[in-house]
Amino acid sequence: MSVADINKQEVVKQFARGTNDTGSPEVQVALLTARINELTPHFKAHMKDHHSRRGLLKMVSRRRRLLDYLKKNDADRYRSLIEKLGLRK
């Protein structure tokens, strides 16, 4: 198993709402946040990598849409997720 798979399983286990939960908004946002945080140092070193930056921006916008959905439907879950991930300052 690769390091990414192990990290992914840990994130899913930490944010899952049930035993087999992999698709809830909390899990999806947590996985996207982990991938975004993993890619951020790459862009500090390779500022002109615009092709990969587009993928990063797509991930950020997907996370934003999921957070908007969660905020609209269940504000308490939204606030707890933001607090756990440390997204808002």
Swiss-Prot record:
GO terms for biological process: translation. Coiled coil: none annotated. GO terms for cellular component: cytosolic small ribosomal subunit. Keywords: Ribonucleoprotein, Ribosomal protein, RNA-binding, rRNA-binding. Pfam families: Ribosomal_S15 (PF00312). One of its GO terms (molecular function) is structural constituent of ribosome. One of the primary rRNA binding proteins, it binds directly to 16S rRNA where it helps nucleate assembly of the platform of the 30S subunit by binding and bridging several RNA helices of the 16S rRNA. Forms an intersubunit bridge (bridge B4) with the 23S rRNA of the 50S subunit in the ribosome. NCBIfam families: S15_bact (TIGR00952). Part of the 30S ribosomal subunit. Forms a bridge to the 50S subunit in the 70S ribosome, contacting the 23S rRNA. Belongs to the universal ribosomal protein uS15 family. This is Small ribosomal subunit protein uS15. It comes from Ralstonia nicotianae (strain ATCC BAA-1114 / GMI1000). The gene is rpsO.
